[in-house]
UniProtKB/Swiss-Prot annotation:
InterPro entries: FluC. The keyword Flavoprotein does not apply. This is Fluoride-specific ion channel FluC 2. The gene is fluC2. It catalyses: fluoride(in) = fluoride(out). Na(+) binds at G72, T75. It comes from Moorella thermoacetica (strain ATCC 39073 / JCM 9320). Belongs to the fluoride channel Fluc/FEX (TC 1.A.43) family. GO terms for biological process: cellular detoxification of fluoride. The lineage of its organism: Bacteria, Bacillati, Bacillota, Clostridia, Moorellales.
């Protein structure tokens, strides 16, 4: 039955990523992939928040649906990689490096902040 929880969370995460990335892309013009950056950073925060919840705070199936399902489908390593490689291919190595470092370091920072937020809330 766990597969059903992961699948439902995954559907919701995929749709959230698609809609949010498209919405941001239509409002913020430029060459920086802000949609992917935003979903990956906010996903890192959500995962940090979820991981810091006290054991048993949420039912195991809900944690599975939210963590593996929703956040796993919401964030996108493949799009991040594609955008980075495309920047490098376009001769924009410095921009690719800044995007990569911002994504990775920002993700770690936001996961930690999510962890801290959960600790102060619960």
């Amino acid at each position: 039955m766990a597969w059903l929880y992961v699948g439902c969370g995954g559907i919701a995460g995929t749709l959230a990523r698609f809609l949010l990335s498209r919405w941001l892309g239509n409002r913020v013009r430029g060459t920086w992939p802000l949609g992917t950056l935003f979903v990956n950073l906010s996903g890192a925060f959500l995962l940090g928040l979820l991981l810091a919840l006290p054991q048993g705070r949420l039912p195991a199936n809900v944690t599975l649906a939210l963590g593996t399902g929703f956040v796993g489908a919401y964030t996108t390593f493949s799009t991040f990689t594609y955008e980075t490689v495309t920047m490098i291919g376009d001769g924009e190595g410095k921009r690719a490096l800044a995007y990569s470092l911002g994504s990775i370091l920002g993700g770690l920072l936001l996961a930690w902040l999510g962890w801290l937020a959960a600790g102060s809330l619960f």
